[in-house]
Regions:
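Expand to "…catalyze enediolate/carbanion chemistry for C-C bond making/breaking, isomerization
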Residues: 1-163
């Protein structure tokens, strides 16, 4: 991501306040009790969202990595993001304040096929949630033409992965 400048905003963020949190299922085995693990994951997301909102410096960002959750099921992961995470942002009154960017080993943007090189931008070794403050995303977007970034990334990823 940083080496190839896929996200020009990432390099600066890495030098600031970054939190990485690995979620292993909490007190619940995600395989024997998936609903309990989802509740635990939602609790971790809520805690991290609250901490990110309360942080008063610049450049704060958080990653919640969930290697034992959703790894084989991209659709369930996206359902969780679109339903549960969205509801959590609403309940905490954080829509427009914090956004959650989804990353997954099998990530696919809507309207693309599995081999589309643009999907690589949001693919990761494990399912994870990237929490970003909107004010910083907006400031970074104001400094860059995001459409040109996307087009450049697609060309680069096509070249790198020969898709």
């Amino acid at each position: 991501m940083i080496k190839h400048n896929l996200c020009p905003f990432a390099k600066e963020a890495i030098s600031k306040q970054v939190t990485y949190r690995v979620f292993d299922g909490g007190d619940t085995d995600p395989f024997s009790s998936p609903s309990g693990a989802l509740k635990s994951l939602t609790k971790v997301l809520k805690e991290e969202l609250s901490e990110l909102e309360a942080f008063d410096g610049d450049g704060a960002t958080s990653f919640i990595i969930a290697p034992s959750m959703f790894s084989g099921d991209f659709q369930k992961y996206m359902d969780f993001v679109n339903d549960d995470v969205s509801d959590l942002l609403t309940n905490l009154d954080l829509h427009g304040t914090i956004q959650v960017a989804p990353f997954h080993p099998h990530f696919m943007f809507g309207g693309t096929n599995q081999n589309d090189p643009g999907n690589k931008v949001n693919q990761s070794p494990h399912p994870m949630f990237h929490l970003l403050r909107e004010v910083e995303v907006s400031a970074a977007s104001d400094q860059q033409d995001t459409q040109k970034i996307w087009e450049r990334n697609e060309r680069l990823l096509t070249k790198l992965f020969r898709c």
